[in-house]
């Protein structure tokens, strides 16, 4: 019960945050669904068109400036926080429409700007400690945990881990048996 009332939301406000925020939240992104197709040449064309349109539309797009926060979209939040986020649907749709990667910003921004939920954050300084996910980006994109990683998983203070693969059924069975 030591974590009761905590919001496990990863917050990233590091050095690259300001640049990333300006790029993703203040510009207008129109063709994002077409930037990751199976045709590589088409991706490059749509990225260039999107950048051009974004720069042309910049003087006409008036996005409210706010205190943004960014983080992983894996969260565990209280029911009260979830109800608050859902109640902000109209604001989220109007402010985050035609932005890039809004799933990394909208919930974190709502929590960051709400005094009660911000105070309940498990960690304001470490994105993955904050969401209590054990995710290894240094060895993979993300790294896939295997049976060889049992000790690391066992000694982690995190509540969840990502990512596993059905190709290694032993680790999945071990996780179920050990933590259920």
List where the protein language model places each region.
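ER/Golgi luminal nucleotide-sugar-dependent glycosyltransferases, focusing on the catalytic module
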Residues: 1-180
């Amino acid at each position: 019960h030591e974590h009761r009332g905590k919001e496990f939301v990863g917050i990233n406000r590091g050095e690259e945050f300001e640049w990333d925020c300006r790029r993703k939240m203040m510009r207008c992104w129109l063709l994002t669904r077409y930037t990751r197709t199976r045709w590589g040449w088409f991706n490059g064309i749509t990225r260039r068109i999107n950048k051009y349109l974004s720069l042309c539309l910049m003087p006409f797009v008036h996005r409210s400036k706010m205190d943004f926060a960014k983080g992983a979209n894996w969260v565990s939040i209280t029911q009260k926080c979830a109800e608050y986020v859902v109640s902000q649907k109209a604001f989220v749709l109007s402010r985050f429409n035609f932005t890039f990667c809004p799933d990394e910003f909208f919930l974190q921004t709502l929590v960051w700007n709400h005094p009660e939920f911000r105070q309940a954050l498990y960690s304001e300084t470490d994105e993955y400690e904050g969401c209590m996910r054990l995710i290894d980006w240094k060895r993979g994109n993300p790294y896939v945990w295997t049976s060889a990683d049992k000790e690391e998983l066992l000694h982690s203070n995190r509540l969840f881990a990502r990512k596993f693969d059905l190709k290694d059924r032993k680790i999945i069975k071990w996780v179920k048996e050990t933590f259920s």
